[in-house]
């Protein structure tokens, strides 16, 4: 098993240290574990986000994982990444940060429009216009070529799963397919009964021929030991005719 959606206590809404996640993954039989804690951003204002690490903690995050990667070499492969939104005005900083820290990968977790300083949260009930903005933002992000996969692609909260919703999700899925970017089936959302995973969305993904990857979205180390929810997710996807993949494209 492999998982590339793992958080740590640094993001303020997860618990447990990097090493605790690694030990849980080894015990559960994972062969590769990728860490993708919420990225800091170098905001133009004095805004402080309560759901991501500060920029001055990033170096220690990377150094800690590199040391643990060496410590557990031969037992498990460790990849170092971040979960990032697509914030156009901050993308140059993100590219520089990826290169500076030689990150293995990043995933696109598109929580906010433009920036979480002032932008709307896409996981709240959306209007048609806001749903279109979500899809547009995901598409623009995927087209950068930076992201290894799209996390919780069905995060967008749109109550009426009507023809408009399906049209917009088809638009998203088509670009993901064209760019060979996998779509994540999110175990945290599945276990906690959020609006995602959305069966309507994954039926569209199946019809469009998208690749689907299971992401634990672990916010505590015990999530990596939950084989029951993992098997239920496999059964869910198999019922839809989807065989999830495990491999992703790395930046280096």
Give the residues covered by each predicted segment.
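An N-terminally biased module of ancient metal coordination in phosphate/nucleic-acid-related enzymes
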Residues: 1-84, 93, 159-173, 180, ...
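Short amphipathic alpha-helices and their capping/turn segments at secondary-structure boundaries
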Residues: 18-31, 89-103, 134-144, 171-174, ...
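Short, hinge-like loop/turn segments at secondary-structure boundaries
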Residues: 51-53, 124-125, 201-203, 230-233
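Hydrophobic alpha-helical segments and helix pairs
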Residues: 76-121
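Domain-core and long-helix interface of multi-subunit machines
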Residues: 107-208
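Mid-to-C-terminal alpha-helical segments outside catalytic/metal-binding sites
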Residues: 227-252
């Amino acid at each position: 098993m492999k998982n590339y959606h793992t958080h740590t206590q640094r993001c303020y809404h997860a618990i447990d240290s990097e090493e605790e996640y690694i030990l849980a993954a080894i015990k559960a039989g994972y062969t590769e574990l990728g860490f993708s804690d919420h990225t800091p951003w170098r905001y133009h204002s004095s805004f402080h986000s309560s759901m991501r690490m500060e920029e001055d903690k990033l170096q220690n995050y990377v150094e800690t994982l590199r040391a643990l990667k060496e410590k557990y070499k031969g037992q498990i492969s460790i990849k170092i990444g971040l979960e990032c939104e697509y914030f156009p005005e901050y993308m140059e900083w993100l590219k520089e940060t990826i290169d500076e820290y030689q990150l293995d990968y990043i995933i696109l977790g598109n929580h906010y429009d433009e920036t979480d300083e002032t932008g709307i949260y896409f996981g709240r009930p959306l209007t048609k216009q806001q749903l279109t903005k979500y899809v547009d933002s995901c598409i623009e992000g995927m087209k950068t070529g930076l992201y290894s996969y799209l996390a919780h692609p069905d995060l967008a909260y749109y109550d009426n799963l009507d023809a408009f919703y399906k049209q917009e999700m088809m638009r998203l899925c088509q670009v993901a397919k064209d760019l060979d970017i996998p779509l994540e089936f999110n175990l945290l959302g599945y276990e906690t009964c959020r609006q995602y995973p959305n069966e309507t969305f994954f039926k569209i993904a199946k019809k469009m021929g998208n690749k689907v990857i299971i992401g634990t979205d672990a916010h505590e180390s015990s999530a990596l030991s939950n084989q029951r929810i993992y098997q239920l997710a496999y059964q869910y996807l198999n019922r839809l005719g989807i065989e999830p993949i495990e491999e992703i494209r790395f930046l280096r």
